[in-house]
Regions:
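Amphipathic alpha-helical segments
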Residues: 13-28
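Vicinal oxygen chelate
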Residues: 4-11, 53-116
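Short secondary-structure junctions
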Residues: 25-32, 81-87
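N-terminal beta-strand motif that seeds the catalytic metal site of vicinal oxygen chelate
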Residues: 1-15, 45, 59-62, 112-116
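Conserved short beta-strand elements that form part of the metal-binding/catalytic scaffold
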Residues: 28-59, 105-112
Length: 116
């Protein structure tokens, strides 16, 4: 069964959101990037991504651990996924991306998300 393991949120004020989630939910900063900060509660990853001209505030991507991509691919298509599975670059946490019927990005990781 696929499991939600990652969520990325675009923010016009990354520092404010990092402070909110680390204070209110006691999440830990697990690593930083020039344009994002990654938090974890030990089971779930949350990335706060800087807003830019291409990204609007709000949901950027929802990430799932998946066990069987072949079965899931058929389920995604039957449920109305708005795109086919797209392979992701090797340095990406997920192996594939697909979009739900509303166009939201879904990242699929076969190897599992690195949760610290």
């Amino acid at each position: 069964m696929p499991r939600i393991r990652h969520l990325a949120i675009v923010s016009p004020n990354r520092e404010r959101l990092v402070n909110f989630y680390t204070t209110a939910f006691e999440m830990r900063v697990v690593y930083g990037h020039p344009t994002s900060t990654h938090l974890s509660d030990g089971d779930f990853n949350l990335a706060i991504v800087d807003q830019n001209s291409d990204l609007k505030p709000g949901l950027y991507v929802l990430g799932f651990d998946v066990d069987d991509l072949q079965d899931l691919e058929g389920s995604l298509r039957n449920a109305g996924a708005s795109s086919d599975l797209t392979p992701m670059p090797k340095d990406h946490d997920a192996e594939y991306r697909v979009h739900d019927p509303d166009g939201n990005r879904l990242d699929l990781a076969i190897h599992g998300w690195c949760v610290v």
